[in-house]
């Protein structure tokens, strides 16, 4: 009954906070039920914000084993914010959140399939607003409209506008990614001109910054000096490929940031080698995903 209630909560159209409640109305706390099967490090830094993008391939790719492994990874790594892509089963995501009591979340309501979700620490952030961009015109996004989540960082009253996206792959993917990127740039340009300047766009762009000009979707942002890709720093380092699976080793999971948010290049960017902490890529892929999480700290 409790799990059914959790599923009902996550599907409520108006329940954007998606707070998981027990039948008594209290927040379900199952932190003590976390597994301890892996040796994940704590990457959280008290003096910085730690933000991760993570494509969790067909979540949950391995049912309860995925829930156990991913919840352990999140609570051990303990970043402040994670943007997840490729949530295949929403009810199972609510099950994951029951094991992450330190986090609140928002999840897609208008994706045709494969939702996005953003989780954030309750004690650090307040949710201001949320919306799904281009939900009425999402063809170029393959039915997965980008999800914007505006948060206030309580410590400094800083407003962050996070946009979680999962670009089209395969077939007519490049053309549609280019058009999607133009739409997104026009939207962010308009918002920035209105004074909303602290954007972080993160997710699976399904393109590599190493690709030749014209062969990727990044041009609108690369040609705008108000924004930059921290992930450009590591995209040529094959050991940090966010998609390390042969024969398509590539860097697909990028983070774009407003320069005004991170002045003087005061940030760190890295791909988290989760596969090494789990023993091998094949084990990681079996339990969680074929994409690596990418971490931005500033």
What is each PLM-predicted segment?
Residues 2-100, 104, 110-116, 136, ...:
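N-terminal, active-site-proximal structural segment of metallo-dependent hydrolase catalytic domains
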Residues 47-52, 113-115, 143-147, 158, ...:
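Residues that flank catalytic or metal-binding motifs in active/ligand-binding sites
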């Amino acid at each position: 009954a409790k799990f059914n209630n959790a599923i009902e909560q996550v599907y409520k159209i108006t329940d954007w906070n998606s707070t998981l409640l027990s039948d008594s109305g209290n927040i379900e706390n199952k932190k003590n039920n976390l597994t301890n099967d892996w040796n994940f490090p704590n990457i959280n830094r008290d003096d910085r914000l730690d933000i991760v993008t993570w494509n969790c391939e067909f979540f949950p790719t391995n049912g309860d084993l995925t829930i156990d492994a991913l919840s352990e990874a999140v609570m051990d790594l303990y970043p402040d914010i994670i943007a997840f892509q490729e949530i295949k089963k929403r009810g199972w995501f609510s099950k994951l959140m029951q094991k992450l009591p330190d986090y609140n979340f928002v999840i897609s309501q208008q994706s045709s399939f494969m939702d996005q979700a953003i989780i954030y620490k309750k004690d650090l952030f307040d949710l201001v607003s949320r919306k799904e961009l281009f939900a009425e015109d999402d063809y170029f996004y393959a039915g997965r409209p980008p999800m914007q989540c505006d948060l206030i960082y309580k410590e400094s009253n800083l407003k962050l506008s996070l946009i979680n996206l999962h670009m089209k792959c395969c077939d007519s993917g490049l053309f549609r990614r280019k058009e999607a990127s133009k739409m997104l740039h026009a939207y962010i340009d308009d918002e920035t001109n209105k004074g909303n300047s602290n954007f972080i766009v993160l997710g699976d762009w399904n393109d590599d910054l190493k690709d030749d000009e014209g062969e990727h979707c990044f041009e609108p942002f690369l040609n705008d000096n108000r924004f930059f890709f921290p992930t450009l720093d590591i995209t040529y380092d094959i050991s940090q490929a966010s998609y390390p699976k042969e024969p398509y080793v590539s860097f697909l999971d990028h983070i774009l940031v407003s320069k005004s948010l991170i002045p003087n290049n005061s940030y760190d960017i890295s791909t988290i080698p989760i596969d090494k902490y789990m023993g091998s890529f094949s084990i990681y892929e079996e339990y969680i995903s074929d994409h690596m999480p990418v971490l931005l700290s500033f």
